[in-house]
């Protein structure tokens, strides 16, 4: 498994943050699932389904999970599906 330095992790987080703002952040008039209104919205699925975003998420998740005794990853379908896929692909890649 690949070990990342603190500097590498910070750079990956910066890249992911930039991509989230570029791909997922929108300003406008939005009605949220709760019925409340907002003048901004993050649709993180757009970033999670983007090739670089998926790679960044998978790499960072694997880094965070590397010190834990984890046997699997999962979550609510739709939102978590791309995150789980990215995490498992990077996990396989890193052995």
Describe the role of every protein-language-model region.
Residues 1-95:
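PRPP-associated nucleotide enzymes
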